[in-house]
Amino acid sequence: MALKKYKPITNGRRNMTSLDFAEITKSTPEKSLLQPLPKKAGRNNQGKLTVRHHGGGHKRQYRVIDFKRNKDGITAKVDSIQYDPNRSANIALLVYADGEKRYIIAPKGLQVGQVVESGADADIKVGNALPLQNIPVGTVIHNIELKPGKGGQLARSAGASSQVLGKEGKYVLIRLRSGEVRMILSTCRATIGQVGNLQHELVNVGKAGRSRWKGIRPTVRGSVMNPNDHPHGGGEGRAPIGRPSPMSPWGKPTLGKKTRRGKKSSDKLIVRGRKKK
């Protein structure tokens, strides 16, 4: 998809860009694959705020996505490419030979009418899902499982991809987009290709209201708060934070402080850590 630019007829339109949705072939979703998605506004079951900057936004329905790709031996035809308000990637509606319909994340280059399949014997082509042990070294993949049968968890957002680097015993070496090299069980599945909608990261929102339509509320700087609201708050005028390092609203060091818990069982599976920005 290409970027669409607007004439600067208002301050909100100036520099605003959006996607032209040229890849989208159908606007109405498949009813059998929809579920209600009630608003949470960042609150938990006690009504307490657990996620900041969430609230409002347009009503949405959840599209049930097949992350497991476990329907082996039955070919499926790509019926349409659709927009999904719940993720950055587009989704593709598959119609299997037995009549079942499922949504998958639409990889780059997937076309309407194309035939895809899952299983160890599937061909190495875009949209097919296979166990990692059956995918050649050097192949670009997405929607990668961390546990066999759990469903894809890695490389699912727009433009995301990983690469198979090698195979060692029951593990396969994968290079993630962050630069991290990780060992994953060879029986875990992944889908061939890169996630589509690559232009998503280039979109300029243009105005605050467009973020509100998405359910994103403003992010207020701690330095403009009061001392009882944030460790950076208080002082006369534009005062410095007065601490050795920046702090989170709850007084924990942030902006560079590592937050990964030590001695995780998966530490032994990380061959090389992610690249530093």
From Swiss-Prot:
Disulphide bond pairs: none
Keyword check for Ribonucleoprotein: yes
Organism domain of life: Bacteria
NCBIfam families the UniProt entry points to: rplB_bact (TIGR01171)
Biological role: One of the primary rRNA binding proteins. Required for association of the 30S and 50S subunits to form the 70S ribosome, for tRNA binding and peptide bond formation. It has been suggested to have peptidyltransferase activity; this is somewhat controversial. Makes several contacts with the 16S rRNA in the 70S ribosome.
Record's subunit section: Part of the 50S ribosomal subunit. Forms a bridge to the 30S subunit in the 70S ribosome.
Keyword annotations of the record: Ribonucleoprotein, Ribosomal protein, RNA-binding, rRNA-binding
SUPFAM superfamilies in alphabetical order: Nucleic acid-binding proteins, Translation proteins SH3-like domain
UniProt cross-references to PROSITE patterns, sorted A to Z: RIBOSOMAL_L2 (PS00467)
GO biological process: cytoplasmic translation
Residues covered by region (Disordered): 34-55, 213-277
The keyword Translocase belongs to this UniProt entry's keyword annotation: no
Family, per entry: Belongs to the universal ribosomal protein uL2 family.
Name the record gives this protein: Large ribosomal subunit protein uL2
Gene Ontology cellular-component terms listed: large ribosomal subunit
Pfam families found in the cross-reference section: Ribosomal_L2, Ribosomal_L2_C
